[in-house]
């Protein structure tokens, strides 16, 4: 815990002033002038309290040692086990820019459009449970430099003949992608982290544990190599698209560009922490999440459905459907069969899509971080 040099009170990171604030005497301090001394940059570890949920095994870090009363990941109301640990320092951190009040306001605006959501999700006491958590990310810096040799062609028609001319296209490539980011926590769903993006990397600062005071941090347990291929693929896809739209090669149909032709290379991988306001909702064995980007205020929520509200909405929707079916009695038999077939296929498609989506969420089949952890067991 950080203590005020003036009165000994507890210091927390104040989002509004972007400085450390004493809760007792209201004195402000520079986050980089506290606690770690001149050797902070040379110290590769920092001391934290690790809280572990006895139900789901999820872990969060804190510079404070006050007991955490609930788990952000599974929603369980329980006292988390704690221990002191030495954690590896990330290279950079984006401090929280959006306050808890701003987070709650953004969430409330989102909930106005969620007519089938359970009423508990609008309860002020529930919304007040938003917890500020720094999520670990890997930031990849990727370069593409070298000579470029591509095969292109142009097709034209001359009388009864279709003529295809082949060309050898050359050029010099110089591209650089800064900070392609992927979350480094198996507890943080990849889909949520992707939808919360982007973060403005200009807001990154050198890491100091002072920024964690008053907040929590998730543990980093997914290796950078899990996402390195994805980062290089993203860079290659973006470069390929730009080459195709470049005026130099306009009018040419190019063969598929292979990654090795672009000289894609990962130059640097930085460990970072990005701010997320996190809220979980537990109903029996189901857990849903609402998250807010702590820098931009973007809301990403997996909002559950209240069966009673949904049933009422379905009954109201049944009225125009009944009218449609009544009108269908006047259709020709062939038209009626075709309409019924199309509606049936649409229903089957929606049902299958939802089944696959639920299965992927339950098993984490499309989450690279979770699959990585499972492969280690």
List the predicted regions and their residue ranges.
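Hydrophobic alpha-helical transmembrane segments
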Residues: 331-344
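Extended hydrophobic
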Residues: 270-321, 344-359
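Short cysteine-rich clusters marking metal-coordination/redox-active sites
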Residues: 4-7, 22-25, 53-56, 71-74
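Short linker/helix segments within small regulatory modules
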Residues: 13-20, 61-69
């Amino acid at each position: 815990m950080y203590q005020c040099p003036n009165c000994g009170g507890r210091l927390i990171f104040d989002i509004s002033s972007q400085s450390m604030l004493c809760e007792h005497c209201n004195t402000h301090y520079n986050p980089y002038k506290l606690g770690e001394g001149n050797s902070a940059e040379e110290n590769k570890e920092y001391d934290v309290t690790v809280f572990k949920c006895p139900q789901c095994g999820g872990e969060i870090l804190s510079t404070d040692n006050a007991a955490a009363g609930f788990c952000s990941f599974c929603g369980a109301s329980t006292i988390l086990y704690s221990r002191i640990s030495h954690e590896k320092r990330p290279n950079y951190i984006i401090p929280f820019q959006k306050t808890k009040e701003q987070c709650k306001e953004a969430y409330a605006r989102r909930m106005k459009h969620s007519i089938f959501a359970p009423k508990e999700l609008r309860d002020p006491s529930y919304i007040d449970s938003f917890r500020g958590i720094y999520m670990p990310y890997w930031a990849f810096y990727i370069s593409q430099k070298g000579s470029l040799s591509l095969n292109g062609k142009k097709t034209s028609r001359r009388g009864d003949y279709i003529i295809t001319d082949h060309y050898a296209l050359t050029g010099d490539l110089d591209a650089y992608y800064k900070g392609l980011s992927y979350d480094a926590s198996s507890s943080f769903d990849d889909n949520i982290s992707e939808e919360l993006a982007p973060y403005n990397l200009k807001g990154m600062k050198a890491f100091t544990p002072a920024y964690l005071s008053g907040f929590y941090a998730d543990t980093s347990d997914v290796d950078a190599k899990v996402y390195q291929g994805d980062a290089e693929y993203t860079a290659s896809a973006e470069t390929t698209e730009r080459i195709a739209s470049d005026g130099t090669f306009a009018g040419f149909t190019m063969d598929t560009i292979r990654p090795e032709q672009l000289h894609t290379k990962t130059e640097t991988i930085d460990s970072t922490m990005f701010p997320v306001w996190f809220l979980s909702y537990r109903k029996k064995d189901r857990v849903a999440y609402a998250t807010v980007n702590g820098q931009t205020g973007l809301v990403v929520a997996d909002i559950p459905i209240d069966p009673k509200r949904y049933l009422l909405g379905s009954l109201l929707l049944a009225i125009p459907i009944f009218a449609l079916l009544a009108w269908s009695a006047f259709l020709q038999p062939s038209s009626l069969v075709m309409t019924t077939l199309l509606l049936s296929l649409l229903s089957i498609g929606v049902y299958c899509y939802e089944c696959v989506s639920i299965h992927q969420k339950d098993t984490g089949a499309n989450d690279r971080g979770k699959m990585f952890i499972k492969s280690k067991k």
